């Protein structure tokens, strides 16, 4: 397992764990980052990750990406 912030783009990955404080986990869940869900890193732009999750493209910063394990 490693944080999403360390992943190279292109390959879909299943999320086994979402860490952090409860408020951070809840926020990430509302964006679609749930255990068992699939996420694909599309690109990195100015320290932000562009990811596909639940048929949506979302930008998250490195701090949030560190809480999402794949």
Label every model-predicted segment:
Residues 1-70:
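Compact, glycine-rich, soluble single-domain proteins
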């Amino acid at each position: 397992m490693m944080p999403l912030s360390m992943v190279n783009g292109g390959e879909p990955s299943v999320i086994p764990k979402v860490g952090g404080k409860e408020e951070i986990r809840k926020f990430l869940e509302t964006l679609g980052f749930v255990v068992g869900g699939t996420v694909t890193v599309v690109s990195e732009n100015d320290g932000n990750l562009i990811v596909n999750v639940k048929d949506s493209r979302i930008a998250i910063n490195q701090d949030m990406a560190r809480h999402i394990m794949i």
